[in-house]
Amino acid sequence: MARKGPKRHLKRLAAPTSWYIERKAYKWAVRPRPGPHNMRTSIPLLYIVRDYLGYAKTAREARKILNEGKFLVDGRVRKDYKFPVGIMDVVSIPETGEHYRVLPNRIGKLILHPISEDEAFIKPLRIRNKRMIKGARVQLNFHDGTNHIVSIAEKDNYFTSYTVLMKVPEREILEVLPFEKGAYVFVTQGKNVARKGRIVEIKRFPMGWPDVVTIEDEEGELFDTLKEYAFVVGTDKPKISLP
């Protein structure tokens, strides 16, 4: 039997556990569109308007608010109620002056962390990989599915797992944060999700085993997590506010 295309429906009981939604109130949930984030690390914009912030009581009201262009994601108006909003994205409401950054909490749920207006123009982007393209240029691919092109002379300034502080919506690089000992990181997944601290040691393993980092939190406690889960957010101290 031939494939019928991608799934378009999602039951609430099967929705990602990172969503703050009532699972037994209704049968169906909004399935996010394919976009910058995967379904597990993002949440549809409709739930932010209705369930998280309470600006609407029904999905119809939430869609109407979005169609009026009252919500910005990373400085751009988003009207698609299925648009996936993920980790480190900035949600802004110009009419009320509210700004939030999407981050996980200690139980792995995605939350809206209030931030200042000045910080709303800064978005940390983790470099997943980079590749050469035509014209002797290098394309940096980030964790949110976006990319940025730099000259080949600058390629040695950017490496995998480094974080780029990007000015949004202009997409201008403000600063590069290297992934190294002493860097301040925020854990985005795993059993230590939402913990933060400085890198003490980077353990590299052969035969394709994932690298592990040892982190010292603000209380002086040491813990390990996968390198992939550690998101650099500063050098001596974080460049953004954290929960």
From Swiss-Prot:
Keywords linked to the UniProt accession: Ribonucleoprotein, Ribosomal protein, RNA-binding, rRNA-binding
Domain of life (superkingdom): Archaea
The protein's assembly and partners: Part of the 30S ribosomal subunit.
Family: Belongs to the eukaryotic ribosomal protein eS4 family.
Name listed for the protein in its UniProt record: Small ribosomal subunit protein eS4
GO-annotated biological processes: translation
GO molecular function, one term: structural constituent of ribosome
All residue ranges annotated as the S4 RNA-binding domain in the record: 43-105
Alphabetized InterPro entries for the sequence: KOW, Rib_uL2_dom2, Ribosomal_eS4, Ribosomal_eS4_central_region, Ribosomal_eS4_central_sf, Ribosomal_eS4_KOW, Ribosomal_eS4_N, Ribosomal_eS4_N_CS
Gene3D superfamilies assigned: 2.30.30.30, 2.40.50.740, RNA-binding S4 domain (3.10.290.10)
Pfam families in alphabetical order: Ribosomal_S4e, RS4NT, S4
Gene name as annotated: rps4e
Organism of derivation: Pyrococcus furiosus (strain ATCC 43587 / DSM 3638 / JCM 8422 / Vc1)
Cellular compartments per GO CC: cytosolic small ribosomal subunit
